[in-house]
Amino acid sequence: MKKQSTMIACALAVVSGVLLCLGGCNQSPEVVIYSNADEESRLAMQDALDRAGFSGQYIFSSFSTSELGGKIMAEGSNIEADVITASTYYLESAQQAHRMFAPLSFTFHALEKTPGFCAPLTAQEGAIFINTRALQENGLPRPASLKDLASPAYKGFISIPNIRSSSTAWLMVQALVSAYGEQEAGCLLHGMMENAGPHLENSGSGPLKKVRAGEVAIAFGLRHQAVADRKAGLPIDYVDPAEGNFMLTESVCVTDKGAGGNPLAMKMAETLVRTARPGILKVYPVPLYEGENFREDARSSNVKAFPNR
């Protein structure tokens, strides 16, 4: 009797295993997505994926820009993520070092030439922010360039992002190096950091928060944020610096995991490119693809790209 019970238990276990396999063997594991996107962009991406029927089939993990960039460079093709959205310059550097991304299998029509392994999702330009009220109250001249911000006249009145932790700061540094060369750019950056003092911010959004609050009169940040603030009636204006508005793009790519890769990863990347863009454009209104509407104030007239990105 005991032997018969054991046999029945074994048979039930086998049947359960077969049923489990029938129910789940054809299901792919969840796609792991790593991203440095801010909350608004992340929500637009997740909404696009969910509307495309991928709800519950992915894990979305958020990182800071520097944290994700370091992770990509350190882990290479051993990274857990199946899909990555990050600053394009990190992705290009990682691809050059590790050859870790698969060619995208879907077509898209970007306005600018792109490498075959990634497609742009967002674009941000750098600009100088001004709190017009604070500028007037402190009798400060309106700056026309980034170079102006190194003047002692602005000591204690500016806030800038820290190049060690913020990709927004990279836009500022690119403009300085392109216009003045590395040596003079270094001196100017030092002067700007001295002027910022305790208002040197690790987060790219930190300077915007300080200029909004009137803690400083001038800041450097992402242009579209100042445009939105001015439209909302805040005492915020922006200056397109004489050195030019450098642009930072963030792109999506798929990790090349060979035959063991998740087949849904490429489909999700395509969904982000095709259906997440309308939501992203509400936050980052710079057009990246053919057919996208161009708002007059969405892009400066002096957009530049660093030649050795």
What does each model-identified segment do?
Residues 25-83:
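Conserved N-terminal structural module of periplasmic/extracytoplasmic solute-binding proteins
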Residues 36-37, 41-43, 63-66, 80-212:
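Extracytoplasmic ligand-binding site segments that recognize negatively charged/polar headgroups
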Residues 80-85, 200, 217-222, 237-238:
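Paired acidic/hydrophobic, glycine-rich loop segments that form the ligand-binding mouth/hinge
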Residues 89-95, 212-235:
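A ligand-binding cleft/hinge motif common to bilobed small-molecule-binding domains
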Residues 110-113, 124, 156-164, 188-194, 198-201, 271-292, ...:
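Periplasmic-binding protein-like
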Residues 129-134, 248-264, 280-283:
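A bilobed periplasmic-binding-protein/Venus flytrap-type ligand-binding module shared by bacterial periplasmic
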Residues 183-184, 286-309:
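An extracytoplasmic/periplasmic, membrane-proximal ligand-sensing/linker region
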